[in-house]
Amino acid sequence: MLCHGRAADGRDPRGDGVSTVDEIRAQAREVAAGWAPPDAPQSWQLTAALFGVIAAHEALLRRLAELPSDRLPALLASAAVSFLVRRDRPMPLAGYFPEPGRPQPGFDAGFFPAARSFVSARLDDVSAICQERRYQMNEVARCAQIALGIAATASPEAPVALVDLGTGAGLGLQLDRYRYLVGTRSSGPRAAALTLSCEARGSHLPPRAGLPPITERAGIDVSPIDLEDGAARAWLQACAPPEASALARLDAAVKTARLHPVNVIPGDVVDVLPGVLDSFPAGREVIVTDAYLAVFLPPERRARLVGILAAAGRGRRVTWLSLDPLVPLGPSGRDSVQGLALPAQLVRDYQRHGVFAALGARTFDHGTESGRLLARAHPSGQWIEWLSPDAA
């Protein structure tokens, strides 16, 4: 989600592909801070507290420092702990974690000693899970933000092909099958199994999330999730924030995806993308989306990604929508990972607080290119603040 310890261009400064204990501690602390703003709902306390425990557990941090940095060690550890707690139900710790279909349990200071003791006692198990698995963040609430980006950039009424990079279980490819409530506006199928609510902040209203017809859809992921596999679904659940509402969203989205299977191609997104784009009908408009993926690509791979999109955009309209956590922005950074100029106030706000993302769009349209920063957004889809066109 949020990472420190990288150079301003995103490179690992040591070049060894791993993070130090201090870097992982900073990652965990930053995630904890992101879930503990002054206006945070009570249901966020557990997530913030869990990452606080991870940040303070020296033995766990040393184990995590053995992992490649692209495995997102702090996030992976939180999922491993959640997985074991949900599977084994150790008390009293399990009493703090929500169960599907039930209300959010209460939270108190007893969580901290219970969690510390559990991590210490099960350190080998937590470490083994982190060695074996990858973190899969399928926060379907982000679809509300992505849908607004599509509504703002796609050609009205024209059919589009949708490609989701790092799609995991492919839940983001179902976004036209969800209903949205953004501020006081609603859109999407009335009979949808899932309604996603997103607070609209600021003085500029985002567009209504009316989506064009999606005629083709494909996802790419290095480790796709088979939703027909119960063990895979259990891991996906462990990667969700430990909130009753997040589990309910995930359950509804998984049911929707199982009813409407999509094509998810295994492999590196940069290697696989050209073939996917070539598979669509000639001239078909394409929307390519990613949420927290491009930031973790090495700079040369990001440049290759842009080159692929630009090449495809010589004969069709291709729009790349990205939710970017603005990492690694650094103290002197002024551009997003997409290469879009950031408003000075947004940079200052990020450097002070660092708990929001940027939604940006780059469009390659028959040889011409344009780009625009659309909004700032909560990392897990809770709110969006649309920016005016002259915000920069």
Language-model features: locations:
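N-terminal amphipathic/basic-hydrophobic helices that include classical n-h-c signal peptides
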Residues: M1-G17
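A short N-terminal interaction module
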Residues: D12-D125, I129-Q136, V140-I146, V160
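Class I S-adenosyl-L-methionine-dependent methyltransferase module
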Residues: L67-S69, R87-P90, A94-A121, E132, ...
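Domain-level detector for long C-terminal conserved domains
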Residues: A231-A234, A238-A248, P266, A312-A392
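Conserved SAM/SAH-binding loop
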Residues: G267-D271
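Short amphipathic alpha-helix with an adjacent loop that forms part of the alpha/beta core around
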Residues: L273-P281
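A short SAM/SAH-binding and catalytic strip from SAM-dependent methyltransferases
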Residues: V286-P299
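A short, conserved alpha-helix within the catalytic core of class I
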Residues: L297-G307
